[in-house]
Amino acid sequence: MATFDDGDFPAQTHSPSEHEDFGGYDNFSEAQQPPTQHQSGGFSSFNGDPASPNGYGFGASSPNHDFSSPFESSVNDANGNGGGSGGDAIFASDGPILPDPNEMREEGFQRREWRRLNTIHLEEKEKKEKEMRNQIITEAEDFKKAFYEKRDKTIETNKTDNREKEKLYWANQEKFHKEVDKHYWKAIAELIPREVPNIEKKRGKKDPDKKPSVNVIQGPKPGKPTDLGRMRQIFLKLKTNPPPHMMPPPPPAKDAKDGKDAKDGKDAKTGKDGKDAKGGKDAKDLKDGKPADPKVTEEKRPSPAKDASVETAKPDAAASGEGEKPVAVTEAEGTKAE
Protein backbone atom coordinates (compact mmCIF):
# COMPACT_ATOMS: atom_id res chain seq x y z
CA MET A 1 0.00 0.00 0.00
CA ALA A 2 1.36 3.31 -0.95
CA THR A 3 1.70 6.02 1.70
CA PHE A 4 1.97 9.76 1.64
CA ASP A 5 5.57 9.63 2.76
CA ASP A 6 6.59 7.36 -0.06
CA GLY A 7 5.44 9.94 -2.59
CA ASP A 8 2.81 7.75 -4.17
CA PHE A 9 -0.47 9.47 -4.67
CA PRO A 10 -3.81 7.76 -5.39
CA ALA A 11 -5.25 7.91 -8.86
CA GLN A 12 -7.63 10.67 -9.69
CA THR A 13 -11.27 9.65 -9.87
CA HIS A 14 -12.50 12.76 -11.60
CA SER A 15 -11.78 14.19 -14.95
CA PRO A 16 -9.37 17.02 -15.46
CA SER A 17 -12.14 19.10 -16.91
CA GLU A 18 -13.75 19.55 -13.51
CA HIS A 19 -10.85 21.75 -12.43
CA GLU A 20 -9.89 24.03 -15.16
CA ASP A 21 -7.48 26.13 -13.18
CA PHE A 22 -5.59 23.42 -11.42
CA GLY A 23 -5.10 20.23 -13.36
CA GLY A 24 -2.16 19.04 -11.29
CA TYR A 25 1.23 19.95 -9.93
CA ASP A 26 2.71 19.76 -13.38
CA ASN A 27 0.67 22.72 -14.55
CA PHE A 28 2.52 25.05 -12.14
CA SER A 29 5.79 26.48 -13.16
CA GLU A 30 8.35 28.27 -11.07
CA ALA A 31 7.58 31.58 -12.78
CA GLN A 32 3.88 31.31 -11.95
CA GLN A 33 4.34 30.72 -8.24
CA PRO A 34 3.18 33.73 -6.15
CA PRO A 35 5.78 35.52 -4.10
CA THR A 36 5.81 34.67 -0.41
CA GLN A 37 6.05 37.37 2.25
CA HIS A 38 7.74 36.63 5.56
CA GLN A 39 7.13 38.59 8.71
CA SER A 40 8.97 37.86 11.87
CA GLY A 41 6.88 36.37 14.61
CA GLY A 42 3.69 36.07 12.54
CA PHE A 43 1.43 33.12 11.92
CA SER A 44 0.44 32.11 8.37
CA SER A 45 -3.18 32.49 7.33
CA PHE A 46 -5.11 31.21 4.37
CA ASN A 47 -5.84 33.95 1.81
CA GLY A 48 -6.49 31.85 -1.30
CA ASP A 49 -2.79 31.11 -1.90
CA PRO A 50 -1.04 28.03 -0.64
CA ALA A 51 0.96 28.57 2.51
CA SER A 52 4.69 28.74 2.36
CA PRO A 53 6.37 25.44 3.08
CA ASN A 54 9.06 27.36 5.01
CA GLY A 55 8.41 26.93 8.73
CA TYR A 56 4.86 25.62 8.39
CA GLY A 57 3.37 29.02 7.96
CA PHE A 58 5.49 30.98 10.53
CA GLY A 59 6.64 34.27 9.12
CA ALA A 60 3.97 34.43 6.41
CA SER A 61 2.03 37.61 5.90
CA SER A 62 -1.61 37.81 6.83
CA PRO A 63 -3.24 40.63 4.92
CA ASN A 64 -6.71 39.36 5.74
CA HIS A 65 -7.46 40.48 9.28
CA ASP A 66 -10.42 38.17 9.61
CA PHE A 67 -8.13 35.16 9.71
CA SER A 68 -5.22 36.78 11.57
CA SER A 69 -4.04 35.47 14.95
CA PRO A 70 -4.84 37.55 18.03
CA PHE A 71 -1.37 36.77 19.48
CA GLU A 72 0.51 38.26 16.55
CA SER A 73 1.25 41.61 18.22
CA SER A 74 2.39 39.96 21.42
CA VAL A 75 4.76 37.73 19.51
CA ASN A 76 6.14 40.70 17.59
CA ASP A 77 6.80 42.62 20.82
CA ALA A 78 8.24 39.68 22.69
CA ASN A 79 11.42 41.44 23.79
CA GLY A 80 9.85 44.86 24.24
CA ASN A 81 11.57 46.61 21.36
CA GLY A 82 9.27 45.54 18.53
CA GLY A 83 11.91 43.33 16.96
CA GLY A 84 10.39 40.00 17.75
CA SER A 85 12.40 36.90 17.02
CA GLY A 86 14.93 37.83 14.42
CA GLY A 87 15.80 35.67 11.45
CA ASP A 88 14.53 32.15 11.04
CA ALA A 89 15.09 31.29 14.75
CA ILE A 90 11.98 31.23 16.94
CA PHE A 91 12.15 33.44 20.11
CA ALA A 92 15.67 34.53 19.25
CA SER A 93 17.27 37.09 21.65
CA ASP A 94 17.76 40.61 20.35
CA GLY A 95 20.39 41.61 23.01
CA PRO A 96 20.21 42.69 26.69
CA ILE A 97 17.07 44.42 27.90
CA LEU A 98 19.04 47.01 29.95
CA PRO A 99 21.05 49.59 28.05
CA ASP A 100 24.81 49.62 27.78
CA PRO A 101 26.64 50.28 31.09
CA ASN A 102 28.47 53.20 29.52
CA GLU A 103 25.17 54.82 28.64
CA MET A 104 23.92 54.19 32.18
CA ARG A 105 26.93 55.99 33.63
CA GLU A 106 26.32 58.97 31.43
CA GLU A 107 22.62 59.03 32.35
CA GLY A 108 23.25 58.66 36.16
CA PHE A 109 25.89 61.35 36.55
CA GLN A 110 23.76 63.63 38.74
CA ARG A 111 22.66 60.74 40.87
CA ARG A 112 26.20 59.50 41.22
CA GLU A 113 27.32 62.97 42.21
CA TRP A 114 24.55 63.15 44.82
CA ARG A 115 25.61 59.81 46.23
CA ARG A 116 29.20 60.97 46.44
CA LEU A 117 28.23 64.18 48.25
CA ASN A 118 25.88 62.27 50.53
CA THR A 119 28.64 59.82 51.43
CA ILE A 120 30.98 62.70 52.30
CA HIS A 121 28.25 64.34 54.38
CA LEU A 122 27.54 61.12 56.27
CA GLU A 123 31.23 60.59 56.98
CA GLU A 124 31.55 64.11 58.38
CA LYS A 125 28.40 63.67 60.44
CA GLU A 126 29.62 60.37 61.85
CA LYS A 127 32.96 61.95 62.69
CA LYS A 128 31.26 64.83 64.53
CA GLU A 129 29.03 62.40 66.42
CA LYS A 130 32.05 60.38 67.53
CA GLU A 131 33.81 63.53 68.71
CA MET A 132 30.70 64.67 70.58
CA ARG A 133 30.28 61.23 72.13
CA ASN A 134 33.90 61.20 73.30
CA GLN A 135 33.47 64.70 74.71
CA ILE A 136 30.33 63.68 76.60
CA ILE A 137 32.08 60.62 78.01
CA THR A 138 35.03 62.75 79.15
CA GLU A 139 32.75 65.31 80.80
CA ALA A 140 30.79 62.52 82.48
CA GLU A 141 33.97 61.01 83.88
CA ASP A 142 35.07 64.40 85.22
CA PHE A 143 31.64 65.00 86.74
CA LYS A 144 31.63 61.59 88.42
CA LYS A 145 35.08 62.19 89.84
CA ALA A 146 34.13 65.63 91.19
CA PHE A 147 30.85 64.27 92.56
CA TYR A 148 32.55 61.48 94.49
CA GLU A 149 35.17 63.85 95.86
CA LYS A 150 32.48 66.29 97.00
CA ARG A 151 30.46 63.47 98.55
CA ASP A 152 33.45 62.15 100.49
CA LYS A 153 34.23 65.64 101.74
CA THR A 154 30.61 66.18 102.79
CA ILE A 155 30.54 62.84 104.59
CA GLU A 156 33.65 63.68 106.58
CA THR A 157 32.27 67.12 107.48
CA ASN A 158 28.95 65.63 108.57
CA LYS A 159 30.72 63.03 110.68
CA THR A 160 32.70 65.72 112.49
CA ASP A 161 29.63 67.90 113.04
CA ASN A 162 27.57 64.95 114.26
CA ARG A 163 30.25 63.96 116.77
CA GLU A 164 30.40 67.51 118.13
CA LYS A 165 26.61 67.73 118.31
CA GLU A 166 26.46 64.39 120.09
CA LYS A 167 28.99 65.50 122.69
CA LEU A 168 27.09 68.75 123.24
CA TYR A 169 23.81 66.85 123.50
CA TRP A 170 25.07 64.46 126.15
CA ALA A 171 26.63 67.32 128.11
CA ASN A 172 23.31 69.21 128.08
CA GLN A 173 21.42 66.06 129.07
CA GLU A 174 23.73 65.46 132.00
CA LYS A 175 23.43 69.07 133.13
CA PHE A 176 19.66 68.98 132.72
CA HIS A 177 19.30 65.82 134.81
CA LYS A 178 21.44 67.28 137.57
CA GLU A 179 19.45 70.51 137.88
CA VAL A 180 15.96 69.27 137.03
CA ASP A 181 15.03 68.40 140.63
CA LYS A 182 15.91 71.93 141.76
CA HIS A 183 14.03 73.97 139.14
CA TYR A 184 10.95 72.19 137.83
CA TRP A 185 9.52 75.13 135.93
CA LYS A 186 12.82 75.84 134.25
CA ALA A 187 13.05 72.22 133.12
CA ILE A 188 9.50 72.34 131.74
CA ALA A 189 10.23 75.57 129.88
CA GLU A 190 13.27 73.93 128.30
CA LEU A 191 11.34 70.81 127.26
CA ILE A 192 8.47 72.54 125.47
CA PRO A 193 10.45 74.29 122.66
CA ARG A 194 12.19 71.01 121.87
CA GLU A 195 8.91 69.20 121.30
CA VAL A 196 7.28 71.85 119.12
CA PRO A 197 9.40 71.05 116.01
CA ASN A 198 8.54 67.37 116.42
CA ILE A 199 4.83 68.20 116.55
CA GLU A 200 5.10 70.37 113.45
CA LYS A 201 7.08 67.68 111.63
CA LYS A 202 4.54 64.95 112.42
CA ARG A 203 1.53 67.02 111.45
CA GLY A 204 3.19 68.50 108.40
CA LYS A 205 2.92 65.21 106.50
CA LYS A 206 -0.83 64.76 107.00
CA ASP A 207 -2.23 68.30 107.03
CA PRO A 208 0.40 71.01 106.46
CA ASP A 209 -2.19 73.82 106.71
CA LYS A 210 -3.09 72.85 110.29
CA LYS A 211 -1.02 74.72 112.85
CA PRO A 212 0.29 73.04 116.03
CA SER A 213 -1.68 73.51 119.22
CA VAL A 214 1.40 74.77 121.08
CA ASN A 215 2.76 78.15 120.06
CA VAL A 216 5.95 79.41 121.63
CA ILE A 217 5.52 83.12 122.38
CA GLN A 218 8.68 84.94 123.34
CA GLY A 219 7.63 87.23 126.16
CA PRO A 220 4.16 88.37 127.30
CA LYS A 221 1.95 90.11 124.79
CA PRO A 222 -1.08 92.12 125.86
CA GLY A 223 -4.37 90.76 124.59
CA LYS A 224 -2.86 87.45 123.47
CA PRO A 225 -2.86 84.82 126.19
CA THR A 226 -0.13 82.22 126.09
CA ASP A 227 -1.19 78.60 125.62
CA LEU A 228 -0.06 76.80 128.76
CA GLY A 229 -1.89 73.52 128.18
CA ARG A 230 1.22 71.58 127.33
CA MET A 231 3.08 73.07 130.29
CA ARG A 232 0.33 72.03 132.69
CA GLN A 233 0.24 68.56 131.19
CA ILE A 234 4.00 68.06 131.62
CA PHE A 235 3.90 69.55 135.10
CA LEU A 236 1.14 67.20 136.25
CA LYS A 237 2.88 64.25 134.68
CA LEU A 238 6.17 65.06 136.40
CA LYS A 239 4.40 65.75 139.69
CA THR A 240 2.36 62.53 139.76
CA ASN A 241 4.95 60.19 138.28
CA PRO A 242 8.40 61.76 138.12
CA PRO A 243 11.04 59.79 136.22
CA PRO A 244 13.94 58.25 138.14
CA HIS A 245 16.50 60.77 136.91
CA MET A 246 14.39 63.64 138.30
CA MET A 247 14.05 62.16 141.78
CA PRO A 248 16.25 63.89 144.38
CA PRO A 249 19.09 61.66 145.48
CA PRO A 250 18.71 60.28 149.04
CA PRO A 251 21.19 61.72 151.59
CA PRO A 252 23.89 59.45 153.02
CA ALA A 253 23.35 57.73 156.40
CA LYS A 254 25.88 59.88 158.32
CA ASP A 255 24.49 63.12 156.95
CA ALA A 256 20.98 61.97 157.77
CA LYS A 257 21.97 61.29 161.41
CA ASP A 258 23.65 64.68 161.79
CA GLY A 259 20.67 66.34 160.21
CA LYS A 260 18.32 64.59 162.63
CA ASP A 261 20.31 65.75 165.67
CA ALA A 262 20.45 69.27 164.34
CA LYS A 263 16.71 69.19 163.72
CA ASP A 264 16.01 68.07 167.29
CA GLY A 265 18.24 70.79 168.72
CA LYS A 266 16.59 73.38 166.52
CA ASP A 267 13.12 72.31 167.62
CA ALA A 268 14.10 72.47 171.28
CA LYS A 269 15.60 75.88 170.84
CA THR A 270 12.61 77.25 168.97
CA GLY A 271 10.28 75.78 171.62
CA LYS A 272 12.22 77.41 174.43
CA ASP A 273 12.29 80.75 172.66
CA GLY A 274 8.60 80.55 172.00
CA LYS A 275 7.85 79.86 175.62
CA ASP A 276 10.02 82.77 176.72
CA ALA A 277 8.31 85.02 174.23
CA LYS A 278 4.92 83.94 175.53
CA GLY A 279 5.99 84.55 179.11
CA GLY A 280 7.31 87.95 178.22
CA LYS A 281 4.02 88.87 176.59
CA ASP A 282 2.07 87.88 179.66
CA ALA A 283 4.44 89.79 181.89
CA LYS A 284 4.09 92.84 179.72
CA ASP A 285 0.33 92.67 179.95
CA LEU A 286 0.47 92.37 183.72
CA LYS A 287 2.97 95.21 183.93
CA ASP A 288 0.71 97.53 181.97
CA GLY A 289 -2.11 96.63 184.31
CA LYS A 290 -4.33 95.22 181.58
CA PRO A 291 -5.91 91.99 182.61
CA ALA A 292 -5.82 89.13 180.16
CA ASP A 293 -8.95 88.36 178.21
CA PRO A 294 -10.88 85.68 180.09
CA LYS A 295 -12.16 84.08 176.87
CA VAL A 296 -8.68 83.82 175.47
CA THR A 297 -7.39 82.41 178.69
CA GLU A 298 -10.16 79.86 178.80
CA GLU A 299 -9.70 78.79 175.17
CA LYS A 300 -5.92 78.68 175.32
CA ARG A 301 -4.89 77.29 178.61
CA PRO A 302 -1.21 77.72 179.21
CA SER A 303 1.00 74.75 179.76
CA PRO A 304 2.71 74.09 183.10
CA ALA A 305 5.88 75.63 181.84
CA LYS A 306 3.93 78.68 180.76
CA ASP A 307 2.25 78.92 184.18
CA ALA A 308 5.60 78.75 185.83
CA SER A 309 6.90 81.53 183.66
CA VAL A 310 3.82 83.62 184.48
CA GLU A 311 4.25 83.01 188.22
CA THR A 312 7.86 84.03 188.04
CA ALA A 313 6.91 87.14 186.12
CA LYS A 314 4.30 88.24 188.72
CA PRO A 315 6.70 88.71 191.66
CA ASP A 316 8.94 90.71 189.40
CA ALA A 317 6.05 92.94 188.45
CA ALA A 318 5.02 93.33 192.10
CA ALA A 319 8.55 94.16 193.07
CA SER A 320 8.77 96.72 190.37
CA GLY A 321 5.44 98.22 191.59
CA GLU A 322 6.60 98.41 195.14
CA GLY A 323 9.84 99.98 194.12
CA GLU A 324 8.05 102.68 192.14
CA LYS A 325 5.65 103.57 195.00
CA PRO A 326 8.24 105.12 197.37
CA VAL A 327 9.51 107.24 194.51
CA ALA A 328 6.05 108.72 193.92
CA VAL A 329 5.54 109.34 197.64
CA THR A 330 8.84 111.13 197.99
CA GLU A 331 8.00 113.35 195.03
CA ALA A 332 4.64 114.29 196.59
CA GLU A 333 6.23 115.06 199.90
CA GLY A 334 8.79 117.26 198.22
CA THR A 335 6.11 119.35 196.56
CA LYS A 336 4.25 119.80 199.81
CA ALA A 337 7.38 120.98 201.52
CA GLU A 338 7.90 123.61 198.94
Swiss-Prot record:
Pfam short name (any one): Clathrin_lg_ch
Alphabetized GO MF terms: structural molecule activity
One Gene Ontology biological process: intracellular protein transport
Biased composition (Basic and acidic residues): 102-111, 197-212, 254-304
The organism's place on the tree of life at top rank: Eukaryota
Bilayer topology: Peripheral membrane protein
Matching InterPro entries: Clathrin_L-chain
Bias-annotated ranges (Polar residues): 29-47, 61-73
Region (Involved in binding clathrin heavy chain): 102-163
Compositional bias ranges of the Pro residues kind: 241-253
Residues covered by region (Disordered): 1-111, 192-338
Major location category of this protein: membrane
Coiled coil spans: 122-142
Cellular compartments per GO CC: clathrin coat of coated pit; clathrin coat of trans-Golgi network vesicle; cytosol; mitochondrion
Keywords assigned: Coated pit, Coiled coil, Cytoplasmic vesicle, Membrane
Location(s) in or outside the cell: Cytoplasmic vesicle membrane; Membrane, Coated pit
Role of this protein: Clathrin is the major protein of the polyhedral coat of coated pits and vesicles.
Similarity field: Belongs to the clathrin light chain family.
Subunit structure: Clathrin coats are formed from molecules containing 3 heavy chains and 3 light chains.
Protein name from the UniProt record: Clathrin light chain 1
Organism field: Arabidopsis thaliana (Mouse-ear cress)
